[in-house]
Amino acid sequence: MSKENKTTDFGFTQVPWEEKQKKVAGVFHSVAAKYDLMNDLMSFGIHRIWKKQTIAKSGVRKGDNVLDLAGGTGDLAYKFCQMVGQQGKVILSDINSSMLEVGKEKLTNKGCVGNIEYVQANAECLPFPDNYFDCITISFGLRNVTDKDKALASMCRVLKPGGRLLVLEFSKPIIPLLSKVYDEYSFKALPFLGKIITQDAESYKYLAESIRKHPDQQTLKQMMYDAGFDNVEYQNMTGGIVALHIGYKY
């Protein structure tokens, strides 16, 4: 079947393959201005711990080239700028211009200049040379990508041999009671918060649905192997609500 006739998930709705990117763009154009505030409210601030653990596992050192993909408002990129020093370089990349603009303004105001670039790019066809980055991170972005297999292969292409990919993403809770509470919170509280804070309940309804349609821990692990990564491992956080996958290129 050609891509023109294929459909894909947009939350719980099936949409034409080529339309998902436009619909996801609409979501993030809508939420960009309040993105950081909503992250704190929705996760009770725990997203900062998840990201801190990701940074600690990244192995980033002075002089490294780092790609923070779907980097949004720059939480990871800001720390990486400090870690690589002026000898290294961080590229904060996002497909969404609104998110990228918020991230650029935020990091510039924090004094993050000189060793960072901002690139609007599609994860499925990254505009970077082969074997270029020491480390790639994608935090809460992979589930919004239309062709995840193609994106993972693109990440593998631009990663140096010996480099590593870290995927921080919502996943499948491993505790049944937690899963029930999480479902109740996701489908009721998130759209309500979205309506109150951003006047946009639908975008946060999509968020809850997109999490449920994202591959589980083992499936994503295999997808990373299939894309060319080796020694893929994952660590569950907060009972599997979030998982950090790490894969290496050799």
From Swiss-Prot:
What keywords would UniProt list here?
Menaquinone biosynthesis, Methyltransferase, S-adenosyl-L-methionine, Transferase, Ubiquinone biosynthesis
Pathway-wise, it operates in: Quinol/quinone metabolism; menaquinone biosynthesis; menaquinol from 1,4-dihydroxy-2-naphthoate: step 2/2; Cofactor biosynthesis; ubiquinone biosynthesis
Name the InterPro entries on file: SAM-dependent_MTases_sf, UbiE/COQ5_MeTrFase, UbiE/COQ5_MeTrFase_CS
Q: Quick check: keyword Cell inner membrane in the entry?
A: no
Under the heading PROSITE patterns, the entry gives: SAM_MT_UBIE, UBIE_1, UBIE_2
Q: Which family does the record assign?
A: Belongs to the class I-like SAM-binding methyltransferase superfamily. MenG/UbiE family.
- Describe the function of this protein: Methyltransferase required for the conversion of demethylmenaquinol (DMKH2) to menaquinol (MKH2) and the conversion of 2-polyprenyl-6-methoxy-1,4-benzoquinol (DDMQH2) to 2-polyprenyl-3-methyl-6-methoxy-1,4-benzoquinol (DMQH2).
The cross-references to PANTHER family, in alphabetical order and at most eight, read:
2-METHOXY-6-POLYPRENYL-1,4-BENZOQUINOL METHYLASE, MITOCHONDRIAL, METHYLTRANSFERASE
Q: What is this protein called?
A: Ubiquinone/menaquinone biosynthesis C-methyltransferase UbiE
The gene from which this protein is expressed is: ubiE
